[in-house]
């Protein structure tokens, strides 16, 4: 299946994982797996479609008030590694000359960020009459003219400055550092298993301009090799492809995954089941590897609730207008689960969190500087209630 690891006869450049001091809060490895486009109530409690995810949620840490930073996908991914959504509301490809008009918080978006969305106009809908926030004219103009080639720092800069290793593992990317928007293609048709919008590293000029950094953006099968050989880096980013991250594609039949196709209506049970199977396989491989004998953490988060949830937000989400008032342009409630070795008790937090909260917590645990919106987080705003404080290990 698309979510499977290929048996790894993969040539790898060994990464030396720095030894971290014992008896402190610093984890040896943090794995961040980003899933797609579902609300908390579609996943947590849905044991029929997502049994493995719910096993994790019932055993480890779960955030019940976690939000996407905004809509759509790309700005959430940018926020997760840079502390800033970079002022865009689109999913366009990377490039110094690439600019795009906003796809969200404008009429025609076609989802819960759209003021003409059926949920707000249908008298039988519980959200009938609700008005979502919208972009201001100034925000539309600024976003439409912003090149998708960002010069700011990311967690990559911070990790390297600290002597910590990192890799980004991308399922279905054709080769390390590939500059393609979608993959694979057959003739002129894109099948979009790999989508560049889920690879935020390619949008930053100081990563694109570095051969060594581009070499760290690798196909997912490399992870199995790195785990088996003890070469897993300190920070591991994992982007499943669109048939494994619960996003889905327009037509999964040519790929051999009909349940990956968008449903005509209702909940996309097939996409959730594929994502649950991917996480079962991937998380199990991590937990069965030697890295799990060390002080390690797995974070599983969904980028946003793209279709069903009113666009609530928190913790530095941008604001737009709602009539004469300002209002949050959030990414709605989405699931987030934290698995930490040595923290056995189930933990549940209703504290408001988002992707900035995850990044800020990682920075805190590794004594890294803050970035952009993570600089506004107090210690009380960090996810230490779910990540644990190190004394439990």
Predicted segment positions?
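N-terminal pro-sequences and low-complexity stem/linker regions of secreted or lumenal proteins
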Residues: 20-393
């Amino acid at each position: 299946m698309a979510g499977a690891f290929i048996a790894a006869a993969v040539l790898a450049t060994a990464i030396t994982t720095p030894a971290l001091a014992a008896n402190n809060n610093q984890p040896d490895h943090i794995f961040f797996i980003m899933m797609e486009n579902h609300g908390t109530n579609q996943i947590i409690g849905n044991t029929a479609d997502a049994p493995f995810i719910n096993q994790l949620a019932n055993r480890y840490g779960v955030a019940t008030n976690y939000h996407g930073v905004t809509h759509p996908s790309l700005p959430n991914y940018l926020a997760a590694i840079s502390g800033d959504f970079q002022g865009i509301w689109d999913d366009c490809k990377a490039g110094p000359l690439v600019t795009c008009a906003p796809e969200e918080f404008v009429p025609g978006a076609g989802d819960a960020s759209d003021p003409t969305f059926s949920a707000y106009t249908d008298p039988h809908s519980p959200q009938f009459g609700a008005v979502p926030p919208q972009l201001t004219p100034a925000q539309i103009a600024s976003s439409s003219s912003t090149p998708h080639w960002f010069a700011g720092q990311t967690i990559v800069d911070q990790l390297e400055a600290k002597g910590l290793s990192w890799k980004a593992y991308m399922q279905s990317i054709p080769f390390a550092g590939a500059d393609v928007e979608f993959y694979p293609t057959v003739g002129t048709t894109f099948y979009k298993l790999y989508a560049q919008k889920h690879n935020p590293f390619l949008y930053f000029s100081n990563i694109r301009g570095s051969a060594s950094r581009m070499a760290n953006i690798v196909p997912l099968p490399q992870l199995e090799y790195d785990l088996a050989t003890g070469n897993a880096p300190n920070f591991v980013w994992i982007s499943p492809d669109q048939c494994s991250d619960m996003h889905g594609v327009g037509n999964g039949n040519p790929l051999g995954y009909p349940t990956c196709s968008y449903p005509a209506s209702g909940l996309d049970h097939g996409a959730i089941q594929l994502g649950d199977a991917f996480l079962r396989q991937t998380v199990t491989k991590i937990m069965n590897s030697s890295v799990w004998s060390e002080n390690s953490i797995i974070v599983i988060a969904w980028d946003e609730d793209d279709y069903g949830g009113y666009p609530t937000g928190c913790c530095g989400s941008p604001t737009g207008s709602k009539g004469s008032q300002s209002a949050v342009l959030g990414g709605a409630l989405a699931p987030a689960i934290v698995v930490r070795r040595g923290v056995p008790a189930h933990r549940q937090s209703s504290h408001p969190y988002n992707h900035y909260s995850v990044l800020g917590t990682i920075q805190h645990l590794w004594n890294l500087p803050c970035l952009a919106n993570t600089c506004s987080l107090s210690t009380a705003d960090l996810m230490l209630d779910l990540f644990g404080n190190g004394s439990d290990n």
